[in-house]
Curated annotation (Swiss-Prot):
Gene source species: Homo sapiens
Lineage, broadest ranks: Eukaryota, Metazoa, Chordata, Craniata, Vertebrata
GO molecular function terms noted in the UniProt entry: GDP binding; GTP binding; GTPase activity
Subcellular location field: Recycling endosome membrane; Melanosome; Cell projection, Dendrite
Catalytic activity reported: GTP + H2O = GDP + phosphate + H(+)
Gene that this polypeptide is encoded by: RAB17
Residue positions of motif Switch 2: 75-91
Official protein name in the record: Ras-related protein Rab-17
Amino acid sequence: MAQAHRTPQPRAAPSQPRVFKLVLLGSGSVGKSSLALRYVKNDFKSILPTVGCAFFTKVVDVGATSLKLEIWDTAGQEKYHSVCHLYFRGANAALLVYDITRKDSFLKAQQWLKDLEEELHPGEVLVMLVGNKTDLSQEREVTFQEGKEFADSQKLLFMETSAKLNHQVSEVFNTVAQELLQRSDEEGQALRGDAAVALNKGPARQAKCCAH
């Protein structure tokens, strides 16, 4: 008896990851490149001078949703400062990185925040302040409390890390990823709500007028 042939069913195409752009800002030698390299490749190099901008990508899963983080690592040297502003455009999040052993880098991170605010609309970009090099805490010039108080005053996320020891590096990027997804979902719900209200109202009726 001939067996019935089953019609092959097309497989559902895997959903594409949702893409978010993340920029790393801060003075030279604070460890921006080291943080990105540690997170993306679990590698560490103490000296990674960036010329202009370096680019990394990583796909992460937040619950059932895949996110693709496009990580733009900007150069911290003053001569590249104006060029780095070009990478602000379209950014969803920014990490303001400073070296906890250098007070000047902490003050410079505050200037980077002002630059961001001048380029982008308030609330347009999610910002986290990151104090790097906790492995050198005996040489600390910026206390945890100083960083936390400034972050709180500006409504920023805040965390301290060590790219060298791989301390809280994944936590920094994963926290940002979770916040970005939550923001995106909330904005999507708000837009759908506005659209539903507009549909319920329907087109405005024009009043008829009679000519006498």
